[in-house]
């Protein structure tokens, strides 16, 4: 199945919604804000502005909205070397921990990964994630780190060592370091960019575990490198497992994301158990904490 991914500005998002309104279909993925099926292609618009076209006619439909076919050629060429790719999941969710994964992928892995349908975890359903993540964990060398909400709240605050960016630098660096310590030799190390290279390097100076290999931060790297896509999927599965465990711990279904539903559930937890319940399952510095407290007034 052909898959085309592009970024849509607000104008293009509105055009997609208008043009394809009569072809609208339902979609259970919480990250999908609009979906449609037309002429052999499924169109998915995500909260991030990511626009995905899937199906035999994906390229043709995508070109109507500005996709240029030649753009795809460079990404396959850039992967013909051993690569370590990293990604994180959970940084945008009030509830749940922060999962960071580094994966080592070589060209010989590509056929298997494409057969599994590996892609950016945000374009896959949770069911698909849960299905293929265990297969990836067995087949691909990787290091997975999970910072629980409780630990996150201990290290991320104005009075502590980290902020929301520096803690991700620490986790990405540690995951890569552990893979390198195992003897893997990538020709390139790619991080799905969450800050500027300059900012990353400034925070990196504070880390104990250092290595000499050059790091590249690229936006939308999960769409360009299979190693990053693998990490995205494993990290997403780890985050979902943690979110389910935390839901069991507190007796409430904890939603992913940081929307109004998170405010409502947080206010229910505050009323039932107090702030200690949120310390256990949520990232307290998010605005949701104050919004939840306001709902109780």
Curated annotation (Swiss-Prot):
<feature type="binding site">
    <location>
        <position position="88"/>
    </location>
    <ligand>
        <name>a divalent metal cation</name>
    </ligand>
</feature>
<dbReference type="GO" id="GO:0004523">
    <property type="term" value="F:RNA-DNA hybrid ribonuclease activity"/>
</dbReference>
<dbReference type="GO" id="GO:0043137">
    <property type="term" value="P:DNA replication, removal of RNA primer"/>
</dbReference>
<dbReference type="GO" id="GO:0032299">
    <property type="term" value="C:ribonuclease H2 complex"/>
</dbReference>
<dbReference type="InterPro" id="IPR024568">
    <property type="entry name" value="RNase_HIII_N"/>
</dbReference>
<dbReference type="GO" id="GO:0006298">
    <property type="term" value="P:mismatch repair"/>
</dbReference>
<keyword id="KW-0255">Endonuclease</keyword>
<keyword id="KW-0540">Nuclease</keyword>
<dbReference type="InterPro" id="IPR036397">
    <property type="entry name" value="RNaseH_sf"/>
</dbReference>
<dbReference type="InterPro" id="IPR001352">
    <property type="entry name" value="RNase_HII/HIII"/>
</dbReference>
<keyword id="KW-0963">Cytoplasm</keyword>
<feature type="binding site">
    <location>
        <position position="192"/>
    </location>
    <ligand>
        <name>a divalent metal cation</name>
    </ligand>
</feature>
<keyword id="KW-0378">Hydrolase</keyword>
<keyword id="KW-0460">Magnesium</keyword>
<dbReference type="InterPro" id="IPR024567">
    <property type="entry name" value="RNase_HII/HIII_dom"/>
</dbReference>
<comment type="similarity">
    <text>Belongs to the RNase HII family. RnhC subfamily.</text>
</comment>
<dbReference type="InterPro" id="IPR012295">
    <property type="entry name" value="TBP_dom_sf"/>
</dbReference>
<dbReference type="GO" id="GO:0003723">
    <property type="term" value="F:RNA binding"/>
</dbReference>
<comment type="function">
    <text>Endonuclease that specifically degrades the RNA of RNA-DNA hybrids.</text>
</comment>
<dbReference type="Pfam" id="PF01351">
    <property type="entry name" value="RNase_HII"/>
</dbReference>
<feature type="binding site">
    <location>
        <position position="87"/>
    </location>
    <ligand>
        <name>a divalent metal cation</name>
    </ligand>
</feature>
<protein>
    <recommendedName>
        <fullName>Ribonuclease HIII</fullName>
        <ecNumber>3.1.26.4</ecNumber>
    </recommendedName>
</protein>
<dbReference type="GO" id="GO:0005737">
    <property type="term" value="C:cytoplasm"/>
</dbReference>
<dbReference type="InterPro" id="IPR012337">
    <property type="entry name" value="RNaseH-like_sf"/>
</dbReference>
<dbReference type="Pfam" id="PF11858">
    <property type="entry name" value="DUF3378"/>
</dbReference>
<feature type="domain" description="RNase H type-2">
    <location>
        <begin position="81"/>
        <end position="297"/>
    </location>
</feature>
<dbReference type="GO" id="GO:0000287">
    <property type="term" value="F:magnesium ion binding"/>
</dbReference>
<keyword id="KW-0479">Metal-binding</keyword>
<dbReference type="InterPro" id="IPR004641">
    <property type="entry name" value="RNase_HIII"/>
</dbReference>
